[in-house]
Curated annotation (Swiss-Prot):
This is SCOCO-like protein 1. Residues 1-34 are annotated as: Disordered. It comes from the Eukaryota. The modification Phosphoserine is found at residue 10. Gene3D superfamilies: 1.20.5.170. One of its GO terms (biological process) is intracellular protein transport. Interacts with ARL3. Keywords: Acetylation, Phosphoprotein. Residues 22-34 have a biased composition (Basic and acidic residues). The gene is SLO1. The modification N-acetylserine is found at residue 2. Belongs to the SLO1 family. Residues 1-20 have a biased composition (Polar residues).
Length: 85
């Protein structure tokens, strides 16, 4: 018997098929887990991006409303000064 045959425990020098299948299943499971994690991260990023866009729109709308109110209050203040003189 050669040293290779002794070290692997099989007469052909190859790993038994059950060990190969186990290794392939573990690799497949790791790949599947990584794919699920990647998809979850991508979905989370998409949700965060959409929420950011929504908040930017709300912020812009509030800024426009503030500008309008500033103009309105400024006009009221000017008109009240005219009446006092």
């Amino acid at each position: 018997m050669s040293a290779e045959n002794i070290s692997t425990g099989s007469p052909t020098g190859k790993q038994p098929s059950s060990e190969v299948n186990l290794g392939e299943r573990e690799a497949g499971t790791k790949n599947e887990r990584m794919m699920r994690q990647t998809k979850l991260l991508k979905d989370t990023l998409d949700l965060l991006w959409n929420k950011t866009l929504e908040q930017q729109e709300v912020c812009e709308q509030l800024k426009q409303e503030n500008d309008y109110l500033e103009d309105y209050i400024g006009n009221l203040m000017r008109s009240s000064n005219v009446l006092e003189k």
